């Protein structure tokens, strides 16, 4: 029989494998399997709960490292709770609802699932972080947060797809959502959102509806969040509940009169080739219609152009003329073949690693 850990509400405490944590508000913690991997995941949860309930008002979180070396940040627990409350209010989560924890607890996304369970008194179902988080859970959760790869994999298997369809509130973050995946989930019955945020904002500060009649290409800031553009055209975030100071991001954005916004790409994902600045994400988006295997756009130094555009591709030999769908100035000058595209632990393209790989393969 799989264990369930029940909160003693009279004394506001929770016991996980014999260890009691005071002041917790999680309803239940359900562990659907007993494996070495799950035991390790439970240990990670216990460690986080110990850190959460110790007297310190702060804890340390780490960035994913998708654009550089991962860094440690000291954040306030009170602000994490404010972030969780903003999300729970927006999604209408309440005591007795259930949340799926299928993200690594090393990063802010996983930690915030637990904090949302704390502030909203949600039941918490554990699934070892993997590409198929729904495979072994017995009951479909009310709420889940996943990365695009987990969603894609879940759609491929009928049993997992049925569970995915039963999730009422689903957040997708940690990486770009391509057009094909967005189309595949458009008719699912639950409310599905793409998230925008970062470790510095304690996960997301804006959501974009992906399915149903309310689907939109724009991100809508959560309550209490205001956005503007810097002189460089990057998004500025003012979210006093979760950030002490306004945050200037590296994300090039476009604002709309209703306060919503779209992200065009990252300022540091620009290739300057022959004096023309190319946004990497724009090229990748255009190529998704013709490339069926994982790929990434990166660059290499060029004595004439300064930088030349390079395509890293995991598929079979690609006819160069297929790239003619791109304007001439956006076309890769080289196609380099690799077995896999470097990713961070959270599933984002690891841009520095891609540049290093291209240098090795040329």
Residues of each region from the PLM?
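Gly/Ser/Thr-rich phosphate-binding loop
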Residues: 157-213
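AMP-binding/adenylate-forming catalytic core of the ANL superfamily
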Residues: 252-330
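Conserved C-terminal "lid"/linker of ANL adenylate-forming enzymes
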Residues: 271, 310-314, 322-362
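Conserved pre-ATP/AMP-binding loop-to-beta segment of ANL
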Residues: 44-62, 95-98
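Conserved AMP-binding A3 loop
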Residues: 57-85, 92-94
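AMP-binding/adenylate-forming
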Residues: 76-82, 98-153
């Amino acid at each position: 029989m799989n264990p369930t850990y029940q909160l003693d509400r009279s004394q506001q405490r929770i016991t996980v494998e014999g260890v009691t944590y005071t002041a917790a508000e999680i309803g239940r913690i359900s562990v659907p399997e007993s494996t070495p991997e799950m035991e390790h995941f439970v240990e990670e949860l216990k460690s986080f709960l110990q850190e959460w309930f110790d007297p310190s008002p702060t804890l340390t979180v780490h960035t994913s490292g998708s654009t550089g070396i991962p860094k440690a940040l000291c954040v306030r627990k009170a602000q994490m709770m404010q972030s969780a409350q903003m999300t729970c209010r927006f999604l209408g989560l309440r005591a007795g609802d259930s949340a799926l924890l299928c993200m690594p607890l090393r990063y802010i996304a996983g930690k915030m699932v637990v904090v949302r369970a704390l502030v909203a008194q949600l039941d918490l179902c554990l699934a070892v972080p993997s590409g198929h988080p729904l495979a072994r859970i017995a009951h479909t959760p009310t709420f889940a947060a996943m990365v695009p790869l987990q969603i894609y994999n879940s759609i491929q298997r009928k049993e997992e797809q049925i569970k995915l369809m039963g999730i009422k509130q689903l957040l997708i973050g940690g990486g770009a959502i391509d057009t094909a995946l967005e189309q595949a989930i458009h008719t699912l019955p639950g409310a599905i959102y793409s998230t925008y945020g970062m470790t510095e904002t304690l996960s997301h500060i804006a959501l974009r509806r992906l399915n149903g009649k309310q689907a939109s290409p724009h991100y809508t800031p959560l309550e209490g969040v205001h956005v503007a553009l810097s002189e460089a055209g990057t998004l500025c975030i003012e979210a006093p509940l979760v950030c002490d100071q306004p945050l200037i991001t590296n994300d090039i954005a476009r604002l709309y009169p209703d306060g919503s916004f779209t992200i065009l790409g990252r300022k540091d994902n620009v290739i300057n080739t022959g004096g023309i600045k190319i946004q990497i994400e724009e090229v990748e988006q255009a190529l998704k219609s013709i490339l069926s295997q994982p790929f990434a756009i990166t660059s290499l130094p060029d004595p004439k152009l300064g930088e030349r555009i390079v395509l890293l591709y995991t598929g079979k030999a690609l006819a160069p003329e297929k790239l003619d769908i791109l304007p001439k100035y956006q076309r890769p000058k080289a196609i380099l073949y690799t077995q896999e595209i470097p990713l961070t632990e959270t599933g984002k393209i690891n841009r520095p690693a891609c540049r290093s790989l291209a240098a090795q393969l040329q």
